[in-house]
Amino acid sequence: MAVIDQDNFSNISWHSEQNAESAASTAQVHHESNSSPEYARSGPDDGRPGDNAAGMEHDELDHSGGEILDCTVSDPHKENDGTKDAYVSYLITTNTTFPSFQKPKTTVRRRFTDFVFLYKVLCRDYQACAVPPLPDKQRMEYVRGDRFGTDFTARRAYSLQRFLARLALHPILRKADILHAFLESPDWNATMRSRSVRGSLASPGGIGDSTLGGSAAAGGGGGVFDTFADSFMNAFTKVHKPDRRFIEIKEKSDKLDEDLNHIEKVVARVARREADIESDLKDLAEQFQKLITLEPGVETAVRAFAASVEDTASGLKKLKDHTDQDYLGSLRDMVAYSGTLKNLLKAREQKQLDYEQLTEYLNKSRTDRDMLASGQSYGAGSALMSGAGGFIRSKIEDVRGVDHEQARRDRQRKLELRIEELTREVEVARNESESFAEQVSREVESFDWIKRVEFKRQFSGLADAHIEFYGDVMSVWEQYVMEMEKEGVVLPA
């Protein structure tokens, strides 16, 4: 515990907007009932009064354009049980004021592969957006065959809940037609088939190629080798004029990842300690049950005490599950989300790099044209000035009997055409780089806002879980004391 006491969290700043106008609270849809209340804690705010509760709701509606899109993932259910095609489906409940929805409240069941399809389509159609990532499918539960266990499905439900919540908070992605169809369509399989056909016709790689979570900067597909070659070459090329804005964003993102990884280790240790205490409490209750046979005269008191200890252990298990499955998972999901933003920053840097390289190529072509126009590439001493390449080319042309003046004019004409083409390409690359940079700046603002809302929800859920646990513990032991007083047991002062 000494290690935990020495942990320093002073380098983390959590921003919360204070809103003094609490009377200007905006109506918002809340989940009054749910088949799995535990999942709802990680969902939208429950409207508890607080210093910034009304302000957060007001900001949320302003940032999202005034339309409500509230999604809850719950009730993991194993379908086709007992067959080789078994899978887990999740209940998605949506409350919305979007006019494109047929009903204000819809419920559908979706499996994980449906989420994967939605994610890939969003990555393909919104390449300038930081599409929130899905929970990693490559986990040991698939190797051990425990992917249908309650612990695994609960963790995944929490992560899918956060995935939809981030989409619902994003000012652009929340308006995507594919998202609305995912949340409402009764024939989702037909939607996937039609989208798959259109995606395969639109790009050579189809939907499956866009798996970078919004970091793919260019449309079309040049093949895996071209992508690898570009990445390899760009690894040794640096931007000549880096934008200070994005350098600071990258530094803040790295610092966020470092802090989240540190907190994750601490929370994981806390969850393990809670599991140890739960096990100890169960052992204690079991040992007191054994005392009944040895001391039958105190059977009532011992049995009530053991039952109270078991209730405390059950409450602690519930708290541990929330800490481990929901809050700890939210830290890991936020690290993955931050990685998506970094990929988007890399894509912006790549566009700037493309623009700078095209500019250099254009300047070099203009220099070559000017040298040809001044006749410096030919003559007795000019061949040495043009370098070994020009010298060798001149000698080869002499051997072949080529007219140097005609060759110079041909090369000059080709350079003029190349310069004209490069000028257009440079202008296109400049406009694309600037527009993409502006979009990335807006994405960073959206990421910061979504992060702030998500942290508030997760902290509220964690606080609620602790309040519920300690309130239940207090009630359990107060009830035990009352029962003992009725039995006439004299309690120590």
Swiss-Prot record:
Subcellular location, in the record's words?
Answer: Cytoplasm; Membrane; Endosome membrane
Q: Which residues form a coiled coil?
A: 248-292, 338-363, 405-442
Q: Which GO terms describe its molecular function?
A: phosphatidylinositol binding
The record ties this protein, via CDD domains, to:
BAR_Atg24p, PX_Atg24p
The membrane topology of this protein is: Peripheral membrane protein
Choose one Gene Ontology CC annotation of this protein and give it: endosome membrane
Q: Where does a 1,2-diacyl-sn-glycero-3-phospho-(1D-myo-inositol-3-phosphate) bind?
A: R111, T113, K137, R156
Q: What is this protein called?
A: Sorting nexin-4
Q: Where is this region: Disordered?
A: 1-77
**Entries under InterPro entries matching the protein:** AH/BAR_dom_sf, BAR_dom, PX_dom, PX_dom_sf
Family according to the record: Belongs to the sorting nexin family.
Q: Does the keyword Protein transport apply?
A: yes
Q: Which residues form the PX domain?
A: 68-190
Q: What does this protein do?
A: Sorting nexin, involved in the separation or division of vacuoles throughout the entire life cycle of the cells. Involved in retrieval of late-Golgi SNAREs from post-Golgi endosomes to the trans-Golgi network, for cytoplasm to vacuole transport (Cvt), and autophagy of large cargos including mitophagy, pexophagy and glycophagy.
One Gene Ontology term of the biological-process aspect is:
protein transport
The alphabetical list of record keywords is: Autophagy, Coiled coil, Cytoplasm, Endosome, Lipid-binding, Membrane, Protein transport, Transport
Source organism of the structure: Neurospora crassa (strain ATCC 24698 / 74-OR23-1A / CBS 708.71 / DSM 1257 / FGSC 987)
Task: Quote the biased-composition stretches of kind Polar residues, using this chain's numbering.
Answer: 7-28
Q: Which Pfam families match?
A: BAR (PF03114), PX (PF00787)
Domain remarks: The PX domain binds phosphatidylinositol 3-phosphate which is necessary for peripheral membrane localization to the perivacuolar punctate structures.
The Basic and acidic residues compositionally biased stretches are 56-65
